[in-house]
């Protein structure tokens, strides 16, 4: 997973520029530059995601910590997040990860890679775990990884929760 992954939802423009269609910012990104989220990068006219499979935070949490009402009370979810965000909130409680890009230094061991199988094994360690919550930062900027992981986890009988800013 150490390699870059080509992003989904973008268009190629003249002059090797691209327009990212993942969020309403619709960033026009010149070669060598990143979008607002700090994780989607134009390399010679192809948009790549730099945070695919890269985890910055993981914890087993009570589902009640999520902004849900009466959703499997008393159960747990594996909460995980990456770096980057399409907002710049001054009050963000996870500023230290949400306002970093995938290429920025965060300290030793701050980002690590996790396969779907590894995440499934973490879910199975807690008997009352019902699934995964993609949280801590904006999960939609992690689109390719969240999509693949969510499908895998669902096929294994687990739930998926996205804690998103909705933009």
Question: What is the meaning of each model-derived region?
Answer:
Residues 1-75:
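Flexible, acidic/Gly-rich N-terminal and inter-domain linker regions that tether
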Residues 42-167:
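Conserved Radical SAM active-site core
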């Amino acid at each position: 997973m150490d390699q870059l992954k080509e992003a989904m939802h973008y268009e190629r423009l003249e002059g090797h520029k691209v327009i990212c269609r993942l969020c309403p910012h619709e960033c026009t990104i010149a070669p060598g530059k990143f979008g607002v989220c700090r994780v989607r990068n134009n390399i010679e006219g192809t948009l790549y995601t730099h945070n695919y499979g890269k985890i910055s935070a993981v914890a087993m949490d009570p589902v009640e910590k999520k902004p849900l009402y009466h959703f499997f009370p008393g159960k747990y979810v594996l909460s995980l997040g990456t770096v980057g965000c399409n907002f710049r909130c001054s009050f963000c409680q996870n500023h230290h990860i949400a306002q970093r890009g995938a290429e920025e230094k965060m300290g030793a061991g701050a980002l690590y890679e996790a396969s779907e199988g590894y995440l499934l094994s973490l879910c199975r360690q807690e008997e009352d775990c019902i699934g995964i919550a993609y949280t801590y930062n904006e999960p939609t900027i992690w689109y390719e990884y969240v999509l693949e992981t969510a499908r895998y986890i669902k096929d294994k009988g687990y739930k998926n929760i996205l804690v998103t800013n909705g933009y």
